[in-house]
Amino acid sequence: MRRALLLLISALVVVAGCSTNGPSSATGTPTKTADIKRSTLDIAYSAFVDQDVHHITSKKALEAALDAARVEAKAQGGKAEVQTPAFQDSDETQLNDFKAFADAVNQLALGVQAAGGQYSAERFADAIVGGMIKASPDCHTQYISASGRVLNSSSATVTGANAMVPAEGTSLGGPDEAGLTGKVLPGGIAYITWHDFTFGGTYKIDAALRAILAKALAQGAKAWLIDLRGDLGGSAIDMTSMFLNGEPTLTVIGKTGNAGTQTANKDLRLPAEFQLPMAVILNGKSASASEVFALGLKENKRATIVGQKSLGCLGSESPNPLPGGASIHVTVQEFVGAVTGAKYNNAGIPPDVVADDATAVAKAIEILKQKI
């Protein structure tokens, strides 16, 4: 941000110095410039390189940004003919790198205008920032344009079915506003599912889950089958603690290294009658909060993970506002296994027992019956 302001002040000084009524200076005509939304690009570049937990370098970020600028220049009627400067292979912002990059982008923009193309500075900037973040793909890193268009850095796609409530069994009620519903299946397997970790207003998913578990116990439940397919987010704060006893759940990694380990809150552990055998179903449509919930259980061998690998969205982001209403969100932390040290962000949580969507519930029931 400070560099962007300094650049803006410098630009104003240049304009003031050239605004005279007399003849041109003997030094020649000032370099022609186009509107490339330079402040937007500067702030976005600085935020991305300074904050990215994956240590994106100035070189990789600006090369990706310049490649995107070339593509957009051609799309707007210009040419992609500009040399790539020698950027620094450093994970810190480089003033000279950005100056060289901005000069190259200016050449492309002027080329569009000279060719009579339909030049749009906004589209140019959107394409550049959107291309830049692809150099460090992560589900939390994204660019949101002033018009509200979301450009993701990661090409990972959400795949798989949503949770499928079995036809048989005794209903436990629902679904409620978080999609929480369940059944006690033959043999005492309590099937529970919800599609969002909701904490809003008077509704708390942890309290609602405890209530439905208590209802299942009253109906003779002997094991928990938690189906988190299609659960893409929310806040899983402390919910894993309900089934653990103070064990470490995940380790937070920042750009500068280990940022601490989270442990289950013993005060939130459910009473002994709730501590039944447990299986959790995941697939490529399980992400973020559902992964955090499953992570601590898997790391501590409290539950058997059944199904397919989860999406792999385990981290946190920092939102950075940009001029004009746009913003760039950068991944600043990722979560790894507190016990094993395994990295799950951008990789997904692998199942202990593989099963496709059609057979996952049956496979989980089979496993739980062996543990009752």
Regions found by a protein language model. Give the residues of each.
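Short, surface-exposed connector motifs at secondary-structure boundaries
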Residues: 114-115, 220-225, 273-279, 300-301
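Short beta-strand/turn micro-motifs composed of small residues
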Residues: 228, 282, 307
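Gly/Ser/Thr-rich loop/hinge elements
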Residues: 232-285, 314-327, 332-339, 343-344, ...
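Short, well-structured beta-strand/strand-turn elements
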Residues: 285-287, 300-314
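Low-complexity, Gly/Ser/Thr/Pro-rich intrinsically disordered linker/tail segments
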Residues: 352-372
